[in-house]
Amino acid sequence: MQRDELEQQLAQGVRRFENCAFDDEDLSRLDLQGCVFERCTFAEASLFAAKLARSHWLRCRAGGADFESVDAVDARFDGCDLNNSKWRRSKLASAAFHGCKLTGASFEEVAHLGIQFEECLLVGADLRGFSFRKATLKELDFSDAYLSGCDFREAVFEGGSLRNATLKLAKFQGADLRGASIEGVRLTEAGLFKGAVISHAQAAAFLRELDLIVV
């Protein structure tokens, strides 16, 4: 479906779209507030500055899509492929991502108060400066992610991974990391976990990096 067709549908009051292909389309600045997209494709599409507040995305594929400067407050994404999507300067307050693939996604300078990720792949994602303070993080794979300056204070990790993530200046005081994989964390970064709760196995892994034998 091309932009003009979508605009016609919206003008007629249509707010639900199923099995539509918007690949490579320029959908920038469209008002899609409250729309529902189910099993639609948006590969490499541009939604620059689109209004997506309260929209619902179900099992959509939007690899490489540009969501820069969108207003997606209270939007919900369920089971979507959003690999390598770009969200720079977007408004994502109270948005929810459940069961989504966000490998390589970029979240630079986003407004994210109350955002929720659950059972998501965030491998290699750029989440620098995000606050997850006091959040319960369920099955989030942050492997190789850019987490510099993130605030994980008092967060609880239920599964998931921080394997080989970039953690410079991240804060973990009071965080419960026992459920997460922290393999690959460099010893020089171990101080970041001061005040965090880790398991005996995780502590032993740190000691092995010092070439100490744990018995």
Which functions belong to the PLM regions below?
Residues 1-215:
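Tandem repeat scaffolds
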